[in-house]
């Protein structure tokens, strides 16, 4: 059976379903093809379930430290089965919400594996979508005027470190653990690795992180990376940076797993009950029919222009499958850009320097714009405003006074180039910095904005004032 659509979206993750909703809002007949569950990696294997686990870890840690607040507790224990049940309940509730939005928008959802066909009896152009349901039924044929590829990504693997789902895991398998290990080696000290390190430590797991770069969080501002490593080391997490894991040395027993890492010419063996491989993500471009089109790929990702168009002008691609900043909110924004572009609304292209990035560890970190080193490399005459949370009353009230807010600005133009934060609840504060950049606010203007007292947001205002040497409380 063949059905015509204005747009068919291949992939029902965050980028795909948001694109579908926007298309439906514009009156376009829309379909989504999803091989698993609507919501994709973010809802089922990433953002949401991991943050639910992080929240449980935070509550567990707070309960153990309750005496610091004058609250005496005895026999605090962790029921990891209930932790997982709560996580799944959160996921299920949000998944039901996404399904409701599809019905509300009268968006057709096809559950199956979608593949792009070349020119055929259905269309002289490549882009007809064949949907294989996998149950012996005849494939559905969808004939769209426009196609959006939103097939997402999966954990990248290190050759030789094959995942077995038991002792060697990716974040996908780790989210489904029924029991916590006593110890774990995390290969990779990027955002995902650090979130897992923080979470598992708060759950009481002994954590060792091995990172190839010379510092953890190598894409973040240098001061943020150093502060994060320092604070997590104080908690008891072990970091080995500038080290190359040697996959061929991995050995397993019934009790643990061992692997060697080379650092400064020396080889050291590390052992733990489990290993988590967290070295980035790989775009899902295989098996979707790209060979039937003129779409260009580079380094395993689909190449697009600023409007998310591929070389086939009627086929767009968004989200992790095109690389760049592999973040759910970026995929959503790109989905809207793609839809509005083929609808003739001339949307603004995405500016990577306006995208907030968040790390949900303890402490949290967040940033938007250029790092100090990037700003200097781009030729800016840089000035810095920095303010510590230890001088913020609300942070002391919370008992979370580590960290700081750092503003990178141009001394000549007074433009805010980047804002970087590490400390309590900064992932909920970074949007102010993003808005300041969108509105081309100067540090002085942010500093003149009245920030209520006592709040953590005062640190932003004070850091802005500090850029001109005018901070009040430090």
UniProtKB/Swiss-Prot annotation:
Enzyme category, top tier: oxidoreductase
NCBIfam families: lipoamide_DH (TIGR01350)
Residues holding FAD: 34-42, 51, 114, 320, 328
Keyword Chaperone listed: no
Gene designation: bfmBC
One function term, GO molecular function aspect: flavin adenine dinucleotide binding
Organism: Bacillus subtilis (strain 168)
Compartments where found: Cytoplasm
Cystine pairings recorded for this chain: 42-47
Keywords: Cytoplasm, Disulfide bond, FAD, Flavoprotein, NAD, Oxidoreductase, Redox-active center
UniProt protein name: Dihydrolipoyl dehydrogenase
Annotated PANTHER family: DIHYDROLIPOYL DEHYDROGENASE, DISULFIDE OXIDOREDUCTASE
